[in-house]
Amino acid sequence: MELVLKDAQSALQVSETTFGREFNEALVHQVVVAYAAGARQGTRAQKTRSEVSGGGKKPWRQKGTGRARAGTIRSPIWRGGGVTFAAKPQDHSQKVNRKMYRGAIQSILSELVRQDRLVVVEKFGVDAPKTKELLTKLQALDLKDVLIVTPEVEENLFLAARNLYKVDVRDVTGIDPVSLIAFDKVLMTADAVKQIEEMLA
């Protein structure tokens, strides 16, 4: 199949496997959920009745006071006591094998092509780290909410895009399922497309 280059009167030959496969919604959902779960810190922690300091002495005798019996002032019933089912640090990451991850990326890229959300150009960059220059180039391509993917992150391009809302710059190794679907359009250079094909082959 072919991808038309936006800035040149030519087309780029790409494989059907990477850019023309059927969209697998269940797979994409599973990989995106796993990716988001892996980003969770999972460091929350609360103390149970045995971990709260104090409470070693019985507050009053068992019988004869007229009050409810109590063995410790750190019971979950008491103010300042432990938590009944205390939250503990845990690892939320989910296992996703390489084949599933590749398949999800290929599904997303193929869907981007079908929805005309993937814009391919021969080359893309800025001469100086100037936001105004980058903005002019993006406006020429009618792009506002965009992920820019290049073979390597050029410093000038990265610095120029840093202050732009809804514009991000990644290299080929930095793309992931979440970033590919988070933006309205994805702008790729021809070299980046070739590298992605090799990476997902």
Swiss-Prot record:
<dbReference type="InterPro" id="IPR023574">
    <property type="entry name" value="Ribosomal_uL4_dom_sf"/>
</dbReference>
<protein>
    <recommendedName>
        <fullName>Large ribosomal subunit protein uL4</fullName>
    </recommendedName>
</protein>
<dbReference type="GO" id="GO:0019843">
    <property type="term" value="F:rRNA binding"/>
</dbReference>
<comment type="function">
    <text>Forms part of the polypeptide exit tunnel.</text>
</comment>
<keyword id="KW-0694">RNA-binding</keyword>
<dbReference type="GO" id="GO:1990904">
    <property type="term" value="C:ribonucleoprotein complex"/>
</dbReference>
<feature type="region of interest" description="Disordered">
    <location>
        <begin position="43"/>
        <end position="66"/>
    </location>
</feature>
<dbReference type="InterPro" id="IPR002136">
    <property type="entry name" value="Ribosomal_uL4"/>
</dbReference>
<dbReference type="Pfam" id="PF00573">
    <property type="entry name" value="Ribosomal_L4"/>
</dbReference>
<dbReference type="GO" id="GO:0003735">
    <property type="term" value="F:structural constituent of ribosome"/>
</dbReference>
<comment type="subunit">
    <text>Part of the 50S ribosomal subunit.</text>
</comment>
<comment type="function">
    <text>One of the primary rRNA binding proteins, this protein initially binds near the 5'-end of the 23S rRNA. It is important during the early stages of 50S assembly. It makes multiple contacts with different domains of the 23S rRNA in the assembled 50S subunit and ribosome.</text>
</comment>
<comment type="similarity">
    <text>Belongs to the universal ribosomal protein uL4 family.</text>
</comment>
<dbReference type="GO" id="GO:0005840">
    <property type="term" value="C:ribosome"/>
</dbReference>
<dbReference type="GO" id="GO:0006412">
    <property type="term" value="P:translation"/>
</dbReference>
<keyword id="KW-0687">Ribonucleoprotein</keyword>
<keyword id="KW-0699">rRNA-binding</keyword>
<keyword id="KW-0689">Ribosomal protein</keyword>
<dbReference type="InterPro" id="IPR013005">
    <property type="entry name" value="Ribosomal_uL4-like"/>
</dbReference>
